Every structure is written in structure tokens, then in C-alpha cells.
Amino acid sequence: MMIITTMQDAIGRTPVFKFTNKDYPIPLNSAIYAKLEHLNPGGSVKDRLGQYLIGEGFKTGKITSKTTIIEPTAGNTGIALALVAIKHHLKTIFVVPEKFSTEKQQIMRALGALVINTPTSEGISGAIKKSKELAESIPDSYLPLQFENPDNPAAYYHTLAPEIVQELGTNLTSFVAGIGSGGTFAGTARYLKERIPAIRLIGVEPEGSILNGGEPGPHEIEGIGVEFIPPFFENLDIDGFETISDEEGFSYTRKLAKKNGLLVGSSSGAAFVAALKEAQRLPEGSQVLTIFPDVADRYLSKGIYL
């Protein structure tokens, strides 16, 4: 039994779930592995980022005991930063577009954060603009700005990716994962590519995202999808992008709950659909890795699981 003194101590070391053709149309002798990041204490992969950003902030002097952390977020990064901030007695302010789930906003407030909403029509760009305005007006504030900060992919390069190699070795055929800020995908993909040069890298986005050549537009899958190209993809040889509809993502989110007891968010459902498609186009015996980024409880009001 691991004894901890703060919830921050429980971040990481998440299990890996193995899927075979028992429940899904996966080719014979192939497997899909999902890193269950929804089991982090804050309920998402972003716990790793929150821990890393605040740790690096203290190391570089950007954060002191009097700092107020300000960040634009769809929710999970805010939850992660608020969770880690508790240990250091830091104030947190998060700017969230109105469209994102009320549960995530309630969790941030429960962890002591101030949540400020921006119009849905302005997207995450509006939240970024508002966050920068707040940072200019509030003394002793720090704006990590995950969408531009190289510490974002670095967090996963140094934490998530080494765990994956330790657990699964270097025989993986493909890495398939959702792209939101781009940090989880870029940091993990770069580490894996350095150790498994032949690994395929497949990004996952919802309809209404631009990575696969589409036009920006509305979508109900939360946590992935971009309005602009993340800056972390330079010199990263991505093999392709899989665009998943809300209907596909929600359908597999429900299946993962009912068939496997995996209570995950819709970005996990989308990632699994994409991983399944990748496994089906690869030779038998292939090993596909994906990430389940967050937990179901923050989306219950969306009616996804009914």
C-alpha cells in the first residue's frame, strides 16, 4: 500500500488496459493498449501537466508563495493546477468558454479556484485573450499558457512516456491519441519515436477541427479539437489524423462503460474508435497504444451515457 500526504503524490503510475478481439473487432493476435489516465487523482492526464507546470514555475522563479496562477482551459488543466496549487497555498483563476461542462467548472471551484466564463462563440481563443488581460492587471500573477508553453509537451515527455515504455516495451506499432493543446500527443510521441523509430503516430480530432484539412466548427466531444495548429509539432513526423464524429465518439464511450466498466470521457471514446480503425488497417499481431485522458463524471449532464 502506498501512503501519501498530498493528492499530488498520487499523480501518475496509472494502469494500462489491454483490449483484444474478445469484445471488439480487433485483428487476431493484435491488441489495443489504453493508458488509463482518467485514474489520476484529478481525473485526467492533465494532472501530470499541472504538477510539472507548477514545479517548473517554482524552479525558474516565475511562481512564489504569493503568486496567482491564471490559465485558459477547457477544464482539466484548471482542475490539475488547482489540485496541485492546494499544496502550495496558491490562488488560481481559470478562464473557461461557456460551452464546456458545468461539472468541470464546479470541480475547479470546489478546489478553491475562481472561474471566469467567456462566450462560446469566441472559443478557446477568447479565453486566451481574457487570460492575458487578467495577467496584465493582477500583480504577482503567472500565466503558464499551456497552448504555447514548451513545458506542456515536456511534462509528458518526462512522465507519461517513460511509464509507457517501462510497461509496454518497444514493440509498439502505433501511437494513436487525441489532440487538444497538443502537449500530451507531442511530448509522448516524440519520446516514443526516439525509442521506437518505426512507430506510427496518428492524431485524433473531432469533426469541426482543422488538423485533417477541415473547417473549424462546433462539436460536442470535449478536450480535443483545435482552432489553430499547436506549436509543438515542429519536426514531429505525424503519419496522419483520424477525424471522429460526435456520434462515433459517444457510441464507443458508452460501449467502454457497458462492456469494460471504463467510465471515461468522450475524448477517450474517440481515441478508442481511432485506435480500432488503426488496428484494422495494420497487419495481424500489431500493438496499438492510445490514451484515455479523462473520467466520465465531469460529463454526466451531457447525456452521453444514457
Curated annotation (Swiss-Prot):
Keyword Transferase assigned: yes
Name of a matching Pfam family: PALP
Subunit-level organization: Homodimer.
InterPro entries, sorted: Cys_Synth/Cystath_Beta-Synth, P-phosphate_BS, TrpB-like_PALP, TrpB-like_PALP_sf
PROSITE patterns reported in the protein's UniProt record: CYS_SYNTHASE (PS00901)
CC terms in the record's Gene Ontology section: cytoplasm
Protein name from the UniProt record: Cysteine synthase
PANTHER family tied to this protein: CYSTATHIONINE BETA-SYNTHASE
EC number(s) per entry: 2.5.1.47
Gene name of this polypeptide: cysM
Molecular function GO labels: cystathionine beta-synthase activity; cysteine synthase activity
Required cofactor(s): pyridoxal 5'-phosphate
Family designation: Belongs to the cysteine synthase/cystathionine beta-synthase family.
Ranges that cross the membrane: none
Binding site for pyridoxal 5'-phosphate: N76, G180, S181, G182, G183, T184, S267
Keywords: Amino-acid biosynthesis, Cysteine biosynthesis, Pyridoxal phosphate, Transferase
Biological-process GO terms, alphabetical: cysteine biosynthetic process; cysteine biosynthetic process from serine
Domain of life: Bacteria
Residue(s) carrying N6-(pyridoxal phosphate)lysine: K46
Source organism: Helicobacter pylori (strain ATCC 700392 / 26695)
